Amino acid sequence: MFFYGTLMAGFDRRRRACIDDRLHYIGRGAIPGALFDIGLYPAAVPAPDGHVWGEVYETSDAPRVLAALDEIEGYREDDIDRSLYRREQTDVLLPDGASARAWVYFYNAPLGRAPRIASGDYLEYLKGR
């Protein structure tokens, strides 16, 4: 799993409390993409010209964790067009230079005039606001 927004450490994680015991923190990582500020949380979209920084986790129970995250992120496997986010497996670059595959929730709605977060790092961005 790759978290780049309010599911990361440092935020109120009550929304993910039901799966915390099934997640094992691996470390920071980055995916190819662009990050935007859409208000209460960020939105990542695939993009070849940038990186989105976040946290990488392993899970001991992928079906249960994905079901919970699908609910949190508004992802409907049977109706992707109406989903707020879409779930995709993506390559994540780890700090040691290795890469891993992880599930990522990409924003699936119009961005409007949302400002791009140039650093791709939501935590860093919030510290500067």
Positions of PLM-derived features:
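Glycine-aromatic micro-motifs
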Residues: 1-129
